[in-house]
UniProtKB/Swiss-Prot annotation:
The gene is dkf-2. The modification Phosphoserine is found at residues 1046, 1050. It comes from Caenorhabditis briggsae. Residues 756-765 have a biased composition (Polar residues). One of its GO terms (biological process) is phospholipase C-activating G protein-coupled receptor signaling pathway. This is Serine/threonine-protein kinase dkf-2.
Amino acid sequence: MDANDFPRLFYTSMPSSSTSNHRIDRLSSSSSSTFRRDDFRRHSTTTSSEKFSTISIGESVKLEEENGEIPEKFVQEEDTVVKTEETRVSDCDFSLTFYTAHVTSSSMLSRGDSSSINNKTFTPDDHYSNPSDKRREVPSIRSTSSNSSSFGGHVAFVDEPSEENQRQQQQYQQHQFQLPTLLVTSTPSTVFDQNDDDVFTSPYHPPNRQYSSSSEMSGLSFQLQSGIHKKSIAVEGNEIALRDLRNEAFQFVKEIYPEKKCGSLEDYILLYKHDLRSINILQLITTSSDVTDGTLVEIVIGSCPQNERIVVHPHTLFVHSYKVPTFCDFCGELLFGLVKQGLKCFGCGLNYHKRCASKIPNNCNGSKQRRPSAIPLSPSNSNILNLNERRQSRRDSCLEALDAARPSSTLGGAATPNIFITSDDCGDPVGGNFLQMPRKDRSCSWSGRPLWMEIAEATRVKIQVPHTFQVHSYKLPTVCQHCKKLLKGLLRQGMQCRGENETEKLQNGAVAKYCKYNCHKKCSEHVAKDCSGNTKASQFFLGTADDGVSEDRDDDLSLRSGSGGHKKAQNTPSAPLQGSEGSGSPGGAVVSFAQGLSNAPDDDVISSESANIPLMRVVMSKKQTKRKNNKLLKEGWIVHYTDQQNMRKKHYWRLDTKGITMYQDENTTRYYKEIPLNEILGVMTSSPEKSSEYLFEIRTGACVYFVYSSLTDEELYNIIHASPCIARKPSTVSSTDSGYLGSSGASSSCVRSREGSTVSSTITVDRTRRGGSTTSTENSEAESESSYSSFASIASTASKYLGRAADCLVLMTKRNGWSDAGSPADEKSSGSLDAQSWTTAIQSALMPVTPQSSVVGGKRVDKLKVPTEGETGHLGAKIQTEQEFSQLYQIFAEEVLGSGQFGTVYGGIHRRNGQHVAVKLIDKLKFPPNKEDLLRAEVQILEQVDHPGVVHFMQMLETTDRIFVVMEKLKGDMLEMILSSEKGRLSERTTQFLVAQILEALRYLHHQNIVHCDLKPENILLNSNSDFPQVKLCDFGFARIIGEKSFRRSVVGTPAYLAPEVLRNKGFNRSLDMWSVGVIVYVSLSGTFPFNEDEDINDQIQNAEFMYPPSPWKEISENAIEFINGLLQVKMSKRYTVAKAQSHIWMQNYTIWSDLRVLEKAVGQRFVTHESDDSRWHAYEKEHNVTPVYV
């Protein structure tokens, strides 16, 4: 074959036309061959560049086939490849001829212009230079390219069927249909196969998707290829979700093979992208970001169905000692310490705090592993690889990683996500298995986050959520997590994604709102929009998903572990995750998922997550007032232990009129614990006849405090021991030792004075038991007196430095059996006297509190104190003593029903009739005189109202410093009912039943011009534990008297349930309660709060997807949503009134009316329904032949 056998293909300059498409003409061809670069150089020795002008940007180009010579400009370009090839397809009745011209170098354009021609559309011309060729052109040919330095044209012409084609078609019909196979080449830059030829047919237009035929479009365009078939797809937006991509591929396969039954073909589809820069041209598509503009997607049909699995690469973490300052790769803070500062991953080499180990992603990429010398650094030298090992490794990783991109919904049904962890991932990527490491280097207690979190992460919708940065001052050296450089400065060093991580503070395990990402101010603009905090919260209700939302399968509770993507790690040992022989999967281990789910929420709970805050009990902040000016009754050093913990603890006790406070020392304000006097049930001294270890005991409802002594055993030894600065721990005290040590002998101690001097002495001590003998001989009276004199001298010497001779003497006389007179101990030792002084002081403090002043905010509040008894108090109640109140009611201090800003509610019982009551104790000392109306409002309102829907007020008693409000006691509250329900939310029927009673109670209160102002589920009490209980409103501490057309402006209520006008400090009226009703209905039906506190309420209300995500609102009626929207109106004039809410169609239901009639029959009073509705519902019963249940 000589040079004349090769067709000549030229690009020539043409004037720009009005159309943006390049025109390509086929002039003539006499043969079909494949050209290489060397062939072009060999057969093109002469040039006539004068004949051809250069190509400029924007000009049209024409592909010609002439007998002229190829311009030198095109021949010498390294990236110029021209190929012609003719292929006959056995399953079609026509043959295809391909002509491909690629210009991939910007130097081929006009001189000095480095731009390129992008996204051009090539279409066949309407005429051919050789009219004898009878060809049918393929309609609507379109091609796009994402390479910014190349443009290309691809032309396909269809021949009329020949005799050979007809014969091949008949042979094909006799054989079974076979799906195209996967071709993998090791030299992608020089090898061309039929899968790389661009054959275009009419573009596919699936339903419900907008496509554009224009070459200039702002969306995403890519190509689908299956065998020799190829389609161009254009979608709006910059990304396409993997679920939609798989659907496009599935529809494409169905279209090109319409006669075949696809069935569950979607389970067999694998999607790859062509990447000529990689060793293996075809790269598995795992995320939506893999599909960019111009990507060629190869559809490969697997030999077996691929179950949905989630791929994780767990880190192999072990304790590591760093020689240079190192920062945590998770939080960015410095790893402090001299040795064993943190954990290092054996695979990827990343470093973490131990505290961060349970939060890190399972994303070990093994980048730390050493590259073998045989592995090339570029694809061009890839033929030296051991292809068998590489293909096996690549095939395993691809098959295991493919399911990270699978949609959860399949044709055959949903499947529970599986997790596959290969043994290669868990072993040593460099030198052997992880278990072969020395035990001292192995970490069996640190790993990543739990597996159920991997499922939630993999199945969530991945949307771009920007970080909310705020200037932050760091207390520890921290690096920027974007540029990995240190945040310099003393204050305001950088920016942090704002908000504190409140995961540990929330008992229901709610996720944090912010990710606390750290970066420089200059780097904040370049940080990716991937805030994990908000994304977690808003993942399940935003349209499409990358990986799809997986459906649950109850019968699949095990997860196969495998290698995979970059996710965050589980709280199980790293080593046990590796595979073992006989595990059931090649190269991997089948790991039971039962343990992973034992402490994790159910899949139903995971799938129902939304951007809204989970419903929880809102705790009002208490005003913790520490009255430093209270009358001090007694103070001193005390050693104590409890019946629950036998460890001796020494603190400086201060007894005042409110309680006992255990301080760290005499001067500090920090205290260890506080025992309020109202929690003390009794104080008892130890019996003199019985030998005991403690002096006296303090009994509370929670535990018993045993007062051991005023000095510890260790401190006593420090006084009497003479060896320099060595304090020995005391031996175990026997029950017959009366609290003193059972050993004797000579010892030494180092006593440091307050000025810092040191005194050392060696003393021999013979210790006696009370009424007993020593281990050597019986002590005589003279020996006892001699020993006592020794101890007395020691105490006197120590007192010069400690200043506590009395305490030393008391302790020694108590423990050694000597009295202060020098004789053996009797019942009236100094220890007993010291115990009696403490018990007397505590018992005196437990007596009724005498009138005394307190200081709040620097102002005296004596105005609220009433010095004499029997008079009328400020609230109109008769002053009584606490003894008189205790004779009438018994308060159960351990039964705390609730606590709030004004006081605490305890359970109690009426001593005379045995009726259980709720007693609200309000401490008047917490309120200054100008807030006295807050105390009076609730009492006045409760005395005024009388309705079955409002809690019944019984009695109010006032003492000198407390107010006792006695009310009826009910079973529980509405919040407890919601949280304890099976799904964490109530059904529509139950919600309607409760809301109907709430609205009726509000109608009564508003008629009395009373606005509750703090309506929330915690303040809605239930009288029973049934599904349809009676409800009553309580807690009128924020209630206000507001007329029909009046407005008030004050601080009221709980922010989570307050209307916008209150939060903005604007005037509010009785419609405030209606907003609260809307929030109550929302949280009852969904189990979440409707709004986020950091976003504008108007924007959240207008965003229907935010307010009502599919889970669970797709199960709730439209009337309920309309009812909520009518209540949650920002403008007060548009908000429903009580009457309008009661007449709403959602509340007008026969089932509700029937349930309410049953309740009224049980109560014995008709207070919710009205007689005017009876005729309408009786007619409904007759029309639908319904038997009433309320009769």
